[in-house]
């Protein structure tokens, strides 16, 4: 299934350290040559300060069991530099500990003023940012987050390093699996990017990177399944970035919609986008939805669902969703089939769901028992009779709000572009006589 593996593409938009979990995940699969994969990991880790990880990778490649002199010397240099940086920031960190329990920590401006007044602190000489970066390169992500948090408190959003700190903080929180904090940092970074004075190309690049990083957060946070749909499908700027720069992200958006039963209203909009982008990107997951909701090809959907399982099993981002995806995909096939045939035989249904008749009957009974399906089973005839299942007022309201929100953002974007064009034209006109 190397044809459907997105690791190579995804790694292009991730920080070097964020690629290591993906690469290690692939080592447990049989998609690529293990020797070549380990050699690539070694090449990548050599660009960091993670000497122990480098040595471990060398052992896995059977290069040597003892650390080469070059690595011994490099490790000593890394530790010396780390100690020097820690000594440089020690006075400020000590002052921060003293001020933590006081009133000044309640407000960042007051906190910075207290540091400047009592400890002669200058934001321009912020060594903590360099220490945080160095700790991060050493793989000490937890300690790095503490210094990055301090930087965000004392830095102005106009600081030249502020954006780098935002990216670093998000990466470190992801790598320490702090999903709640990572989501907060993701939201803060997105707001900064959306409101920054970037050129069109710069904004597109920043959003493309953020989209890839956010997938790691969304599929690990309890609220992520709703948030990924809202951001990728209903925020025009991000949907445009996906369509322009990374249509392969459709896999993750489609997966989120399939496993999110409360957002079935998003299916119609998702299918439109899948059809629009089908000439640039297709995989078994998007093709499954096309078979089911565009072509009503139930046999094709059944075959694609089998392929989807292999794709998900080998995708680091969504492997944890495998069982849920299969369950919800079967339910989607069932619901769609029942819209066309109000009364169906269990044997026919079992064939469409790739299940044995007794398994299919038990599966339907559980759906009815858990109040997820309005239907009745006639055991004598072996029939399933569907009842009507109207859309709840809440879902209707959510659908209308999403639609209005998307249209509002689209109009706001048009107005902003026209305003910029007008300003540029006025600026050009004012210079035409010179």
Swiss-Prot record:
Component of the eukaryotic translation initiation factor 3 (eIF-3) complex, which is involved in protein synthesis of a specialized repertoire of mRNAs and, together with other initiation factors, stimulates binding of mRNA and methionyl-tRNAi to the 40S ribosome. The eIF-3 complex specifically targets and initiates translation of a subset of mRNAs involved in cell proliferation. It is found in: Cytoplasm. Belongs to the eIF-3 subunit E family. Keywords: Cytoplasm, Initiation factor, Protein biosynthesis. One of its GO terms (cellular component) is eukaryotic 48S preinitiation complex. Component of the eukaryotic translation initiation factor 3 (eIF-3) complex. The eIF-3 complex interacts with pix. Interacts with mxt. The keyword Membrane does not apply. GO terms for molecular function: translation initiation factor activity. One of its GO terms (biological process) is formation of cytoplasmic translation initiation complex. PANTHER family: EUKARYOTIC TRANSLATION INITIATION FACTOR 3 SUBUNIT E (PTHR10317). Signal peptide: none annotated. The gene is eIF3-S6. It comes from Drosophila sechellia. Residues 218-391 form the PCI domain. SMART domains: eIF3_N (SM01186), PINT (SM00088). HAMAP family: eIF3e. This is Eukaryotic translation initiation factor 3 subunit E.
């Amino acid at each position: 299934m190397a044809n459907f593996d997105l690791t190579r593409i995804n790694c292009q938009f991730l920080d070097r350290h964020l690629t290591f979990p993906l690469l290690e995940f692939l080592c447990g699969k049989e998609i690529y040559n293990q020797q070549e994969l380990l050699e690539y990991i070694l090449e990548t880790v050599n660009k960091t300060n993670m000497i122990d990880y480098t040595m471990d990778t060398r052992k896995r490649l059977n290069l040597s069991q003892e650390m080469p002199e070059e690595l011994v010397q490099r490790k000593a240099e890394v530790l010396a530099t780390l100690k020097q940086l820690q000594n440089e920031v020690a006075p400020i960190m000590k002052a921060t500990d003293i001020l933590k329990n006081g009133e000044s920590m309640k407000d960042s401006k007051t906190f910075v003023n207290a540091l400047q007044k009592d400890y002669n602190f200058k934001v321009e000489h912020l060594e903590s940012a360099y220490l945080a970066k160095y700790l991060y390169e050493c793989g000490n992500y937890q300690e790095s987050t503490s210094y990055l948090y301090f930087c965000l408190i004392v830095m102005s959003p106009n600081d030249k390093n502020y954006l780098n700190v935002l990216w670093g903080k998000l990466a470190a929180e992801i790598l320490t699996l702090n999903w709640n904090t990572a989501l907060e940092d993701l939201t803060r970074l997105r707001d900064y990017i959306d409101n920054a004075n970037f050129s069109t190309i710069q904004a597109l690049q920043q959003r493309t990177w953020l989209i890839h990083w956010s997938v790691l957060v969304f599929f690990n946070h309890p609220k992520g399944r709703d948030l990924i749909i809202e951001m990728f499908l209903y925020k025009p700027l991000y949907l445009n970035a996906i369509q322009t720069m990374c249509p392969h992200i459709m896999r993750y958006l489609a997966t989120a919609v399939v496993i999110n039963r409360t957002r079935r209203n998003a299916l119609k909009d998702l299918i439109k986008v899948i059809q629009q982008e089908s000439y640039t990107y297709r995989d078994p997951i998007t093709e499954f939805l096309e078979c089911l909701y565009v072509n009503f090809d139930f046999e094709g959907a059944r075959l694609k669902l089998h392929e989807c399982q292999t794709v998900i099993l080998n995708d680091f981002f969504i492997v944890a969703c495998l069982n849920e995806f299969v369950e919800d995909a079967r339910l989607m096939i069932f619901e769609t089939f029942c819209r066309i045939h109000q009364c169906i035989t269990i044997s026919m249904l079992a064939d469409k769901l790739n299940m044995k008749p007794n398994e299919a009957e038990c599966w339907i009974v559980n759906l009815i028992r858990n109040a997820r399906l309005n239907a009745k089973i006639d055991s004598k005839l072996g029939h399933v009779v569907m009842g009507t299942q109207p859309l709840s007022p809440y879902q209707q309201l959510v659908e209308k709000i999403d639609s209005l929100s998307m249209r509002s953002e689209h109009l706001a974007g048009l107005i902003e572009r026209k305003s910029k064009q007008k300003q540029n034209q006025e600026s050009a006109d004012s210079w035409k006589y010179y």
